[in-house]
A protein has these predicted regions:
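PP2C/PPM-type serine/threonine phosphatase catalytic domain
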Residues: 1-282
Length: 282
């Protein structure tokens, strides 16, 4: 299979800082997205630390299988999924320790959604309310579960999905990186097929753009970066209430070759204002 990918991050229409962060590591077929929280730029610190830690741990463990695993990892999982879950556990540890060690960073945290592809095998690791979707044969399937208060209330039948969309508690998370010394990491393993499309996104997209609109955009635009740009533009057109980050991954017929594009609507973390963004490793 041939894989094409692209990512876009934008500050939105309301916020002044971008606390989202993402990274595409093309040679490793690794995609990582994080949405920081904590205010006063500390959300940016948390999301950047999450993405950096997960990426480095996956790289290290791929090169050296003796790299120790962190956290509780199911024995039945593939080695790749174990390494990815371990990376997220380590990211939680790093963020928690950073917050505990710096008074001004107390309370910072982050979501984390990562996808790692090896041939036709997909590993997903997830904490928080950023999402991973799979579009297959015109049907959009959410691969992750939101770790938010309203999502839990919907699962328990306390409120309806429609009520959740109107709730003022949508931003309240019940699970995030850095909140506790240990975190439960959701993992998924899937088999991919030619013409599958994956999308990772922060809640700045899913709170503004409907799933049918997401699916329609992915089907209409074959260039992954332009698809991501169009989804970000839709979120901003509908109000841009939050930072919005989108990674699109297309599995296409052909030789196993990488084509990756990256554009950012927000300035990179290297810029003077420290706003969020993304990075492509190719």
């Amino acid at each position: 299979m041939q894989i094409a990918s692209g990512g876009v991050s934008d500050v939105g229409r309301i916020r002044t800082d971008n606390e989202d962060c993402f990274r595409i590591v093309a040679p490793l077929q690794l995609f990582v997205l994080s949405d920081g929280m904590g205010g006063e730029a500390h959300g940016e610190v948390a999301s950047a630390l999450a993405v950096e830690t997960v990426t480095k741990h996956c790289l290290d463990s791929r090169e050296n299988h003796a790299t120790p695993l962190f956290g509780e990892v199911q024995a039945s999982l593939s080695d790749q999924t174990k390494r990815l879950a371990s990376a997220v556990h380590l990211a939680n540890k790093r963020i928690f320790e950073a917050a505990e060690g710096h008074l001004e960073q107390r309370g910072m945290g982050a979501t984390l959604t990562a996808a790692w592809i090896d041939g036709a095998k997909l590993s997903i690791a997830h904490v928080g309310d950023s999402r991973a979707y799979l579009l297959r044969s015109g049907t959009l399937q959410q691969l992750t579960s939101d770790h938010s208060l309203v999502a839990e209330q919907v699962r328990r039948g306390i409120i309806t999905a429609a009520e959740a969309e109107e709730s003022q508690m949508q931003s309240v998370l019940i699970r995030a990186l850095g909140a506790q010394p240990e975190v439960e990491v959701d993992v998924e393993e899937h088999t991919l097929f030619v013409r599958d499309i994956l999308i990772l996104c922060s809640d700045g997209l899913t709170r503004m753009v409907t799933e049918p609109e997401i699916a329609g955009t992915l089907q209409a635009e074959t260039n992954p970066t332009r698809a991501a740009e169009k989804l970000v533009a839709l979120a901003n057109e509908y109000g841009g209430a939050d930072n919005v980050t989108v990674i699109v991954i297309r599995l296409e017929p052909g030789s196993r070759k990488w084509f990756s594009w990256l554009r950012r609507g927000a300035r990179s973390k290297a810029a003077s204002n420290g706003s969020g963004g993304g990075k492509l490793d190719g």
